[in-house]
Amino acid sequence: MFEINVDPVAFSIGSLVVKWYGIMMALGVIALVSWIFWRIKRGADISYDTVLTAAIIAIPSGIIFSKLLHVIDAWEYYSLNPGAILSGEGLTIFGAIIGATIGLWIYSRYSHFNLGYLLDVAVPGILLGQAIGRVGCLLNGCCYGEYGGSGCSVIYTNPASAAPYGVEVVPTQAYEIIFLLCLFAFSLFIAKKLRPDGQLFLLYISLYAAWRVAIGFVRVNDDFALGLEQAQVVGLILIALAVPFFIYRQRKQKEADKNT
C-alpha cells in the first residue's frame, strides 16, 4: 500500500487557484505540441504554421467536447448547478479526442493538409500528453479504482483530495500511466509498418478504447447505460467504428500494393 498526501492545489495567487491537475494537463498539451515540432525537425512533412493553427483549433474544440460529455454524464448535477458547466473541472479524454479530431477535420477541409498524416505524427505525442495528464489525476485523487486493500493499493490522506479520505483504493490512474507509456513505445515501433496515412491513429483509438472499456470495470464511476460507465459506452462505439475501418483500409492498401 502507498500513501499519497498531496494537496490538489499547487499554489494560489489571490483568488486564482492553480491545481496540479490543471498544471499536468497544460504540460501534456505542451508535450504533444513539442513532440510534433520535434518530428518536423526530423523531417516530418508538416509546416509549423499548420501545427500552430491546428493547435489553436484543436485545443478549444477538444475542451468544449470534453466538457460536453461530462455534462451529459452528470446532467443531474449540472442541471442544478449550471454555473459549474463553465468550470475547468470534469473533463473527459474521449470528449477531448473526439472534439479535437472534428475540429481538425473541419480545418483540413479548408486548408487541404493531410489530416491522416498529421494525426499519425501526433499519436506518440498524444500518448505522452495523456500519461502526463494522468499524473494530475493521480495527484488530484480523481479517477480512482475500487475500494479495498491489495498489495498495490493507495490511500489518500489529504482532506482536499478528490478520493475518499483514508480509504484504500486501486490506483487505476497509475495503471493507465503505465499502459499509455507502453502504447507510446509500441506506436514508435509500429508506425512505419502501417499504411495508408491515418492507420496509426485508428489503431491508437482502437487500443485505447479497448483499455478504457476494460479498466472501467475497476474504476469507481456512476453507471451511464447498460450497467456501464460513460467512457465504456463511448469506447465500445469507437471500437465498433475504428476497428472495421482500420481493417478495411489495411485490405485496400494490400490490394493496391499487389497492383503496383
Swiss-Prot record:
Q: This protein's superkingdom?
A: Bacteria
> Transmembrane segments in this chain: where?
17-37, 52-72, 85-105, 113-133, 170-190, 198-218, 227-247
- Residue sites binding a 1,2-diacyl-sn-glycero-3-phospho-(1'-sn-glycerol) per the record: R134
EC number assigned by the record: 2.5.1.145
The alphabetized UniProt keywords are: Cell membrane, Membrane, Transferase, Transmembrane, Transmembrane helix
Tell me one Pfam family matched here.
LGT
Q: Which InterPro entries match?
A: Lgt
One annotated GO biological process: lipoprotein biosynthetic process
Q: What class of enzyme is it?
A: transferase
GO terms, molecular function: phosphatidylglycerol-prolipoprotein diacylglyceryl transferase activity
List locations, semicolon-separated: Cell membrane
Question: Function, please?
Answer: Catalyzes the transfer of the diacylglyceryl group from phosphatidylglycerol to the sulfhydryl group of the N-terminal cysteine of a prolipoprotein, the first step in the formation of mature lipoproteins.
Q: Which family does it belong to?
A: Belongs to the Lgt family.
What is the protein name for this chain?
Phosphatidylglycerol--prolipoprotein diacylglyceryl transferase
